[in-house]
Regions:
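Low-complexity, acidic/polar, glycine-enriched regions of mature
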Residues: 24-189
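Bacterial N-terminal signal peptides
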Residues: 9-20
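N-terminal targeting/secretion presequences
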Residues: 2-3, 21-25
Length: 189
């Protein structure tokens, strides 16, 4: 064979190999039972946690190509439970989640970063009370038949108008709220 033919053929083969690698096949997952989404903060120095009763998660992810990953979470704010009825009613009210007007929040991220091992970060956007702000989620990916995504983020509540009015005082309720999740996933068939 002539070297004139081999050079274009090798170039084409290299391009096909590069394109095949760039178009990685991320697996698609949806949330399975057993998933949790909780937050922790304090009021007058007393720490408390709350659990979001309903949230739905969709993930597209290939650990070999985290830059192609996507995450979509829809969080139902009605029914948030802290174990204290008065506090739960206050959180549902206009000064906090304002569930009458904003019944849900969303978090979306496109393109994850590897932090080494099974650790990743997702620079995403949280929309809460009609306000969208960047929020970084760091997470551990545990592969398997039902992989898990266990993550943590810090949300600045005042950036979203959560805890307005008399509740703006950060000596009573800190601005930073810790959010953690463990999402059990199942593959989309």
């Amino acid at each position: 064979m002539s070297s004139k033919f081999l050079s274009p053929a090798l170039t084409a083969a290299a391009l096909v190999a590069m394109f095949s690698t760039a178009v990685a096949k991320a697996a698609d997952y949806v949330q399975a039972p057993g998933s949790t989404l909780v937050f922790a903060t304090s009021y007058d120095g007393e720490t408390f946690t709350g659990k979001f009763g309903k949230f739905d998660t969709k993930v597209s992810f290939d650990p070999a190509h985290p830059e192609l990953g996507t995450l979509e979470v829809t969080i139902g704010l009605t029914g948030t439970n802290t174990g204290n009825g008065d506090r739960d009613s206050t959180l549902a009210g206009a000064d906090f989640f304002n569930v009458g007007k904003f019944a849900q929040a969303t978090y979306t991220a496109k393109g994850f970063k590897s932090l080494g091992g099974d650790r990743y970060s997702a620079d995403g956007t949280l929309t809460l009370r009609g306000v969208s702000r960047p929020v970084t989620l760091t997470f551990v990916w545990t592969p398997g038949a039902q992989p898990t995504l266990a993550g943590k983020a810090t949300v600045k509540r005042l950036d979203f108008g959560v805890g307005g009015g008399d509740w703006k005082d950060t000596s009573t309720i800190p601005d930073a709220v810790a959010v953690s999740t463990k999402v059990v996933l199942k593959p989309v068939n």
